[in-house]
C-alpha cells in the first residue's frame, strides 16, 4: 500500500527566480507526494548545505542539476521498495547515504524535498491530511493548534534593496480570536501601511517576503510608520497588535572589530551597546519578540541580551541555532535566548526538524515555524505549524502568492479542524 515505487526530482523556479529542487514520491497504491525545497538569503554559516551547480552558463551558477541527479539516482535507488510511512527510516537512509555532517554530497535541498514529498505521500496513503500525519510522526496524534502569525510588513536587510539594516519588522494580530481573523487584521494593517508610506512620499515596492521596502530615516521609523498604520486600521497597538523584529544581525556585524554597524542611520555599537539599543526600542514600542539580535557566533553577547531582555520578551535564535539540535542543546544549557526559529531546510529533513521542535518545547523554549526568503507555492510549513502545535508561524506579508499560499492553507486547516485547533494568540509568545 505505502511501498515506494518511484522517486523523481526536477528543477523548478522559486520566488526569486532561482532554481530549486522539487521532488515526487510515488507509492505502489498510486498515491503521490510532491514537495519543493525553499532557499534563504541571510543564511547561518552552520546550515546544512544547499547544493548549487556553480555552472555560470546556467542560472548564473545557481542551477540545481547536481541535487536533481542525486534525487533521481542514488536517493531513488535507496528508497524504492521502502515503506513511506516509516519517515524516520526514510530520512536516515538519505542522511547515511550522503555521509557528510552538513548534507554536502547530495545537498539539503535534495534530501529535504524528498523527505517532505515522502511525508505527503504517506499522509495520502493513510487518507489523512498532512498536518494529522505530522502530528502522528511527532508523537502527538490529534493535538493541534493554529499558529499566531508574525507578518513581515516592512522588509530590510538582505530581503530588500533599501537602507534599512534590520531585516524584518513584523506585526502579530494578538487581538484576533481565530487564525482567519488574524489574517484579516494583518491585511488591513498592510493596506493602511501602504497609505501611510505614500503620504510620506515613501516607496510601496515590496521586498522578497512581500513587505514594503522603503528607504527610511532610521530603523525606529519603521516601527513608527507601522504604529500609524495599526491606528489607521482601527486597532490598538499593544492590545490588538504587537510588534516583532528579526535583526539578522550577522548581516551587519563586522567580525574584525566586533562592531554592529547600522549603516542606514550611521550608528555603530558593541554587542552590549546594541543590546541596550534594542532594549530602548522595547521600552518605546510594544515589541514582544526579537530574532537574531546579535551575530550567530556572539554567544557572550547573547548571554547578556538574554539577561537583559529574556524575562520580558521572546528572544528567537535563527542563524544562532540553524534548527540543529546539537547547537540548540548548547543554547539551552547555557541559557541563551528562549526560543528557536524552525526552518526545515537549515537541517534538511522532516525527522530532524521534529526533533528540534521537541527539544525546544521540552526545555520550555518556544518554536516559531518559518518560511525562507526564497519560497515556492509549497505550503508544507502551514501543516507543520498545526501538526506540531508549535503556536507561531513566520511566513511573510500580505502580498506575493509564495507567502499568501501558506496563510490560505492555514485558513483551510482551521476550517477543517474547528475547535480541535485552538488559536491561542499572545499566550504562545515566550514571556507574554
UniProtKB/Swiss-Prot annotation:
**Annotated GO MF terms:** magnesium ion binding; phosphopyruvate hydratase activity
**Compartments (UniProt record):** Cytoplasm; Secreted; Cell surface
Location of the active site = 209 (proton donor), 343 (proton acceptor)
Q: Which GO terms describe its biological process?
A: glycolytic process
Which reaction is the catalytic activity of this chain? Answer: (2R)-2-phosphoglycerate = phosphoenolpyruvate + H2O
EC assignment: the record states 4.2.1.11
Cofactor, how bound (note): Binds a second Mg(2+) ion via substrate during catalysis.
Q: Which domain of life is it from?
A: Bacteria
- Main EC class the enzyme belongs to: lyase
Gene Ontology, cellular component aspect: cell surface; extracellular region; phosphopyruvate hydratase complex
- Positions contributing to Mg(2+) binding: 246, 291, 318
Query: Could you tell me what this protein does?
Result: Catalyzes the reversible conversion of 2-phosphoglycerate (2-PG) into phosphoenolpyruvate (PEP). It is essential for the degradation of carbohydrates via glycolysis.
Q: Which family does it belong to?
A: Belongs to the enolase family.
- Its name, as the record gives it, is Enolase
Query: Origin organism of this chain?
Result: Aliivibrio salmonicida (strain LFI1238)
Q: Which gene encodes it?
A: eno
